[in-house]
Amino acid sequence: MKKYISIAIDGPSGSGKSTAAKELAKKLGFLYINTGLMYRAYAYFLSINKLDINVNEMDCINAIKNANFIFNGDNVKINDNDVSLILRSNDVAMIASVVSANEKIRDLATNEQRRIASENNVVMDGRDIGSIVLTNADLKFYLNTSIQTRAKRRLFQNKDIENLDYESIYNDIKERDHRDMTRKIAPLKKANDAVEIFNDNMKLDECVQHLYEIYLKKIKKLNF
């Protein structure tokens, strides 16, 4: 039986983990899975079918199980329909925050993520990949960035938006971190065996190269 390589990348919101994971996967020729996008896909599917996870949980679970979801990096198809762009909307993000808090939905997503990793060389990012989803991943990273740096980055990215200031962004990120780290189901947590990387002073290409070099050393030890 072929052994596939799995790389888990976790970290707080705004740490650049998704972009770094995507670029690392491209560099390695691996499949990239954005687990946050998976929850958005489930949420969008339930919303267009007028199903509410808080009203009839089992109907929602069965509907998702009977649908055909295809995840490939930033591209997502549901029953052969490309929904990649619409999943990026704020409306879908709001629904996803509710759906992803459901324990049965998380179990469903976790099983799917593990199935994908068992059939592909994969780089998977999220907040509980190394600690819960892929506990036996060949390599685990935890990308960390100070709240100050994340707030500055977000302010720069949204510089054209009026009435957006550093202090409000800082407080939003701080509150988000607290929610993610203290939530009951699948909290944000660094796996004990994860390599923690502080990327405040790194450019994207430097961060990706650093991950890549660590990967090369690890793979030599594993004799792949």
Curated annotation (Swiss-Prot):
<dbReference type="InterPro" id="IPR003136">
    <property type="entry name" value="Cytidylate_kin"/>
</dbReference>
<keyword id="KW-0067">ATP-binding</keyword>
<dbReference type="GO" id="GO:0006220">
    <property type="term" value="P:pyrimidine nucleotide metabolic process"/>
</dbReference>
<dbReference type="InterPro" id="IPR027417">
    <property type="entry name" value="P-loop_NTPase"/>
</dbReference>
<dbReference type="GO" id="GO:0005737">
    <property type="term" value="C:cytoplasm"/>
</dbReference>
<comment type="similarity">
    <text>Belongs to the cytidylate kinase family. Type 1 subfamily.</text>
</comment>
<keyword id="KW-0547">Nucleotide-binding</keyword>
<protein>
    <recommendedName>
        <fullName>Cytidylate kinase</fullName>
        <ecNumber>2.7.4.25</ecNumber>
    </recommendedName>
</protein>
<dbReference type="GO" id="GO:0005524">
    <property type="term" value="F:ATP binding"/>
</dbReference>
<dbReference type="GO" id="GO:0036431">
    <property type="term" value="F:dCMP kinase activity"/>
</dbReference>
<keyword id="KW-0963">Cytoplasm</keyword>
<dbReference type="InterPro" id="IPR011994">
    <property type="entry name" value="Cytidylate_kinase_dom"/>
</dbReference>
<keyword id="KW-0808">Transferase</keyword>
<feature type="binding site">
    <location>
        <begin position="11"/>
        <end position="19"/>
    </location>
    <ligand>
        <name>ATP</name>
    </ligand>
</feature>
<dbReference type="GO" id="GO:0036430">
    <property type="term" value="F:CMP kinase activity"/>
</dbReference>
<dbReference type="Pfam" id="PF02224">
    <property type="entry name" value="Cytidylate_kin"/>
</dbReference>
<keyword id="KW-0418">Kinase</keyword>
